[in-house]
Structure formats: C-alpha cells, structure tokens
Swiss-Prot record:
The keyword Disulfide bond does not apply. This is Transcriptional regulator AdcR. It holds the Pfam family MarR. Zinc-responsive regulator that acts both as a repressor and as an activator by regulating directly the promoters of its target genes. In the presence of zinc, directly represses the expression of the adcRCBA operon, of genes coding for a group of surface antigen zinc-binding pneumococcal histidine triad proteins (PhtA, PhtB, PhtD and PhtE), and of adcAII. Can also activate expression of adh. Residues 1-143 form the HTH marR-type domain. Keywords: Activator, DNA-binding, Metal-binding, Repressor, Transcription, Transcription regulation, Zinc.
Length: 146
C-alpha cells in the first residue's frame, strides 16, 4: 500500500509539472505555427462556439478576469479577435473570432478530442469493474484534494 501511495504522489507531482502555467493538460503537441498560451488557445476554442464576454470566459475557464483580459488583449492585437458591444448595454463587450483564429480554435478542439480519445484507449486496458474502481478512486482523491 505504501508503494501505491508513493506512485500516486509521483503521478500527481508529474501532473503539476506538466500543468505549470497552463490552464489544462492536453496529450500531444499543437501543430499551429502561432505561439499562443494554452489559455489563449482555449479562449479561441470557446469563442468558436459563441460570442462571449470577458466575465463569461473567466467563469468558463475558472480563471480571473484579469487573466482573461491579458490573454484577450494579445489576441485582439494579433488580429484573432474582434469586439462588438451589446445592443442593450454598450459597456458590455462581446468577443468573436476572426478568420485568422478559426483554424487555431479548430486545432485546439481537435487536441481536446485526441486527449479524451487517449484516456478512453487507456481505460480499455481495464475491465468494466476495474474502471469503476478507478472512477471511485479518482472521485475520492479529488474530494480530498479540494
């Protein structure tokens, strides 16, 4: 049991190292030639689905509005985002993708799908009962971490 605890600790430390300064962990590498942060790519992916405000993006990404503002300023400057004001309240600004950003957003979405597919492929190495145990373990561990 002690070795399992050590293995879990090593796994979590590796996750932290891989995730440092990133919003999420994705398997594989982006092939885009554009140097964007993971958060910026995720913003583009969210905006490919619908126009959103800074507050809505921050809530969906679970980051501060300041972090979103910083990421958005750079994306606007690079010509990847356009802004529009709310017709009812001109103080509210919505962001939407430009044609330049669409391929990057699509690639990030594909990267998400590849990551989920990889998790599914790893899970198939275990029986359905083992998968249930893994799920219970992960749920309990997340509960302890929070």
């Amino acid at each position: 049991m002690r070795q399992l605890a050590k293995d879990i600790n090593a796994f979590l430390n590796e996750v932290i190292l891989q995730a440092e300064n990133q919003h999420e962990i994705l398997i594989g590498h982006c092939t885009s030639e554009v140097a964007l942060t993971n958060t910026q790519e995720h913003i583009l992916m969210l905006l490919s689905e619908e126009s959103l405000t800074n507050s809505e993006l921050a809530r969906r990404l679970n980051v501060s509005q300041a972090a979103v503002t910083k990421a958005i300023k750079s994306l606007v400057k690079e010509g990847m985002l356009e802004t529009s004001k709310d017709s009812k309240d001109a103080r509210v600004i919505f962001y939407q993708l430009t044609d330049l950003a669409r391929p990057i957003a699509e690639e990030h979405h594909h990267h998400h799908e590849h990551t989920l597919l990889t998790y599914e492929q790893v899970a198939t190495q275990f029986t359905p009962n083992e998968q249930k145990v893994i799920q219970r373990f992960l749920t309990a561990l997340v509960g302890e971490i929070k």
